């Protein structure tokens, strides 16, 4: 079992990654709102977050720290960041003329510190010469003889080891932003933007889906060598499609649900499966029915849990489904008459079920045209014996489902 210190480090590391993902998504949203389409964002590429807008590159280092932490001139957060950028600049992996280097930290910047002097120009505190002097002084005064901080100092020293010194150039590209929003504040900001896009009631559900897509997309980018970043065009397409799903006349259909392929054997005792067996539907089609039932049940439950449905909406939808079925069922019973054979009953019952399977495409909302919603909802009704296929479905299944002691 991990000790308390190890658990804390693991939790802090996990929170750091979540903060990184959340900030990257927030950056995409900001770019989408303000920068048109000519941009891209990548995570864990050249830096925590790598942002391109036109020909300009922004490399972001993120540091989430506990309240009250200060970014001093000997802070490991500061020097580890400097090491990353110094090594990249020295190796020619970044073009300092076209690259902005941003350190975003939730820590405070003590007045007069190097970080304080490297705030953006509009802060009116920026003083690159003083920042460089402070960093050199901190490095010189340090008594560190080994460890991570020493290697950070060495990387910074190497910038000025050649005929072309780079320390001053590097410093000129760095901006430090202290007291930046933490993961909670970043998510609150995104939730506010989501509320503006789709309304307050649907904002959480909208943001959850956008986050789900983005995290999957970033994982794909990180797992693939040279993986492509999220582009402005791609993000616009995803966001526009998601907004369309949350319109007044629509409901979202989720990919994890459309991909469900349940085990048919687990539903063998369900009443709607027995209804299909009663009329001789084959095992393959029963499998499709189970799939539609599970998908519809899961999607409807999620809509309900997320308060995306209007009062009485499911009841009204099911009323329409039952009434459409009832007229066809009555017509079937009328055509068969009281003397119909079992073979004739099954034949006509299959026609009713074929109508559900191939034609019944009643939409819960005008824009929600996913087929499994209607088909699966009919199976949900069949499971409750509110609809059926065999002319005698109610009597036969009630007898079958009745406890043995009650017969």
PLM-predicted stretches and their roles:
Residues 358-407:
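Hydrophobic, glycine-enriched assembly/anchoring segments
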């Amino acid at each position: 079992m991990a000790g308390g210190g190890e658990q804390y480090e693991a939790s802090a590391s996990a929170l750091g990654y979540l903060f990184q993902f959340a900030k990257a998504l927030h950056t995409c949203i900001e770019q989408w709102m303000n920068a048109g389409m000519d941009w891209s964002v990548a995570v864990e590429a050249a830096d925590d977050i790598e942002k391109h807008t036109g020909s300009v590159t922004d490399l972001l280092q993120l540091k989430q720290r506990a309240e009250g932490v200060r970014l001093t001139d000997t802070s490991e957060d500061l020097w580890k960041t400097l090491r990353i950028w110094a090594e990249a600049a020295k190796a020619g992996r970044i073009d300092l003329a076209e690259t902005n280097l941003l350190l975003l930290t939730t820590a405070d910047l003590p007045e007069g510190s190097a970080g304080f002097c490297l705030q953006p120009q509009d802060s009116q505190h920026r003083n690159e010469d003083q920042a460089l002097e402070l960093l050199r002084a901190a490095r010189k005064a340090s008594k560190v003889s080994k460890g991570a901080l020493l290697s950070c100092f060495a990387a910074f020293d190497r910038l000025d080891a050649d005929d072309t010194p780079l320390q001053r150039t590097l410093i000129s590209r760095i901006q430090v932003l202290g007291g930046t929003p933490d993961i909670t504040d970043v998510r609150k900001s995104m939730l506010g933007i989501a509320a503006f896009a789709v309304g307050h009631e649907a904002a959480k559900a909208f943001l959850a889906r956008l986050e789900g897509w983005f995290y999957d997309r970033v994982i794909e980018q990180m797992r693939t060598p040279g993986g492509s970043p999220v582009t402005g065009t791609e993000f616009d397409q995803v966001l526009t499609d998601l907004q369309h799903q949350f319109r007044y006349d629509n409901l979202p259909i989720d990919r994890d649900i459309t991909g469900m392929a349940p085990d048919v054997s687990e539903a063998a005792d369900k009443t709607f499966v027995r209804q299909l067996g009663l009329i001789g539907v084959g095992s393959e089609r029963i499998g499709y029915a189970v799939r539609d039932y599970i998908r519809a049940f899961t999607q409807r439950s999620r809509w309900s849990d997320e308060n995306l449905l209007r009062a009485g909406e499911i009841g009204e939808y099911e009323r329409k489904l039952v009434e459409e079925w009832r007229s066809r069922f009555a017509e079937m019973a009328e055509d068969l008459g009281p003397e119909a054979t079992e073979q004739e009953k099954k034949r006509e019952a299959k026609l009713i079920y074929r109508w559900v399977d191939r034609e019944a495409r009643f939409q819960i909302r005008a824009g929600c045209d996913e087929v499994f919603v209607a088909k699966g909802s009919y199976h949900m009704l069949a499971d409750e014996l509110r609809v059926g296929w065999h002319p005698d479905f109610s009597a036969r299944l009630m007898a079958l489902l009745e406890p043995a002691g009650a017969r």
